[in-house]
C-alpha cells in the first residue's frame, strides 16, 4: 500500500485538554518527585507556579476563535470540529500561543473521532442522546 497517498479524513472532531505543565522547573522536582508524576496527578500540582491555568486556557480559546472552526469549551477541555488538517493546525497553534506566554512544557490529551458514513457534528451527537433520554423518561 502507498501510505504517502492516503488522505486524512474529510472531517473530524477532537476533544482536547491542554495542560500548561511548567513555566520553570519546580523546586519539588529536584527532591526526586519527578515533574511527570505531578503533571499526571492533579492540575493544582502541575508546576506552573499558579494553581489556575485560566489565563492560558483563555488564550487557547482566542486561538480557536481566530481559527474560524466550530468549538465548544467545557469543564474538562474543548471540542473542536473541522477538517483533520484544520483541527490539528488549531491544536498546534494553541500550543504555540501558550508557549509564547512563557510556558515551556505543555501536554495535551486528545480524543479524535471521524466518520465516513455520514456527516455528524458533536452537537448532533448530544441532541441524539438528549432525544433518547427524553423518550425514555416519558
Model-based region annotation:
Residues 1-138:
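Charge-rich, low-complexity N-terminal segments
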Amino acid at each position: 500500500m502507498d501510505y504517502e497517498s492516503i488522505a486524512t479524513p474529510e472531517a473530524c472532531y477532537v476533544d482536547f485538554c491542554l495542560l500548561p505543565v511548567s513555566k520553570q522547573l519546580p523546586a519539588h522536582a529536584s527532591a526526586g518527585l519527578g515533574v511527570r508524576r505531578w503533571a499526571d496527578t492533579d492540575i493544582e500540582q502541575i508546576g506552573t507556579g499558579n494553581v489556575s491555568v485560566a489565563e492560558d486556557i483563555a488564550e487557547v480559546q482566542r486561538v480557536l476563535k481566530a481559527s474560524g472552526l466550530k468549538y465548544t469549551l467545557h469543564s474538562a477541555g474543548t471540542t473542536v470540529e473541522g477538517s483533520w488538517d484544520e483541527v490539528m493546525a488549531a491544536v498546534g497553534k494553541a500550543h504555540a500561543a501558550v508557549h509564547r506566554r512563557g510556558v515551556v512544557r505543555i501536554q495535551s490529551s486528545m480524543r479524535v473521532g471521524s466518520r465516513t458514513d455520514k456527516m455528524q457534528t458533536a452537537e448532533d451527537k448530544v441532541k441524539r442522546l438528549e432525544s433518547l433520554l427524553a423518550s425514555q423518561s416519558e
